[in-house]
Amino acid sequence: MQSRRPVMLVILDGWGWREDPADNAVLQAKTPTFDALWTNGPHAFLRTSGKSVGLPNGQMGNSEVGHLNIGAGRVVMQDLPRISDAIANGEIERAPGLVAFIDKLKASGGTCHLMGLVSPGGVHSLQDHACALAKILAKAGVKTVLHAFTDGRDTPPKSAVDDIVRLRAELPPNVPIATVSGRYYAMDRDNRWERVSKAYGVIADADGPRFADANAVIADGYAAGVNDEFIVPAVIGDYQGMRDGDGVLCFNFRADRVREILAALLDSAFAGFPRKQVKQIAAAAGMTQYSTALDALMGTIFPPQSLVNGLGQVVADAGLHQLRMAETEKYPHVTYFLNGGEEVPYPGEDRIMVPSPKVATYDLQPEMSAPELGDKAVAAIESGKYDLIVLNFANPDMVGHTGSLPAAIKAVETVDTQLGHIVAAIRKAGGALLVTADHGNCEMMRDPETGGPHTAHTTNPVPVLLVGDNGPLADGQLSDLAPTLLKLMELPQPAEMTGKSLIG
């Protein structure tokens, strides 16, 4: 006899809905579990982009935004429009974090090393934000250089040349591009220090291949068959590296992929790889809060918003037990982001992280660690210990980002198999299960405009399925999931949660 009725949310990361089967890994894959749930049980669609998740109209969602909205149970105004609005109305110039950064650099006389993802993608950054900061720094008389990370993941794989041309046109003439690094190197998040060290080398020590300008770096990469994401870090012109008294300003607003490079640049105790000489940094700031560890080393221009009474807090306050599960790639999303930016687990909250496979790109192993994660999920359900389980399967998103349709099909099929095991365990335990996604990706594997691989997220709706309750389900948005889970758990919905239960 189960001591607790488990209620579970399974997030099929990157599993969007598109009716056309062409270049659609979701529809081309064999998915008997999903198909049976869709045919025989309550189902609906959720909006995961634009204003439905606190982003600008037409802006695709992403995992960070998605999990924030899921956990908060309300539409969370995202950093992208929040920052853009502050730039448009001039408020950013008065932001205490930026004012303090500029004052420190003026006092030290050092150079500002402005860095981040040069991309119109709007997932990790917006290059317009970089240009706005560069103009503010130039106006303040602070010498500034820019370290450009190229995208090709949230944007078409060969779009960096156009991005750099637009960047140069907007940057003040006295702000040069000092280095160029593909995000594969500069924005790792899985402790692959052999990659990060190459980006660090060009930024800190000007140690790497040298080119006359940024476009020459990209052209050299293309000639070698290397797309934007994988551009080998390079030095531009006569850049000589960082010096004592310099400052670091990161314009990415998403936290997870800047933590490693910033730790290497700022943390005197960093041990990921040997550094030639640790520079004495006079000032450091980030567009948003990146982590508790980095808080001790840098300021924040846009501090986090308070998100009280989210899903995790409500469950904990009721004295219930919850479990968060994912492999490495999506572990921060089911913990930190789902908890509204809180890193410390709530009382009664357990966490399981299964290591992601150590491969260069996930098309080489589209199964990733889903089988192990699925086994652990079944064991958790059968344990009778948990009232709420939240699990993320990373495969459809992470393999979708590679642009390989055959690999994405395999990823979807792998996840469907594991979902089958979970459904059986939930039914046996007398529990309830919601299955959905945080955004689309692998349902669109070819770019209709360029004809090339489509590696970015989409603005398509995502399916939502219900097991163990008769429903019916209404269409909605991600912020409606927490109220739905609370209803299944027979817990009251707090006033701060403005989402609506999907169950009629």
Swiss-Prot record:
Pathway: Carbohydrate degradation; glycolysis; pyruvate from D-glyceraldehyde 3-phosphate: step 3/5. Substrate binds at residues 124, 153-154, 183, 189, 254-257, 330. SUPFAM superfamilies: 2,3-Bisphosphoglycerate-independent phosphoglycerate mutase, substrate-binding domain (SSF64158), Alkaline phosphatase-like (SSF53649). GO terms for molecular function: manganese ion binding; phosphoglycerate mutase activity. Binds 2 manganese ions per subunit. Keywords: Glycolysis, Isomerase, Manganese, Metal-binding. Its cofactor is Mn(2+). HAMAP family: GpmI (MF_01038). This is 2,3-bisphosphoglycerate-independent phosphoglycerate mutase. It comes from Rhodopseudomonas palustris (strain ATCC BAA-98 / CGA009). The gene is gpmI.
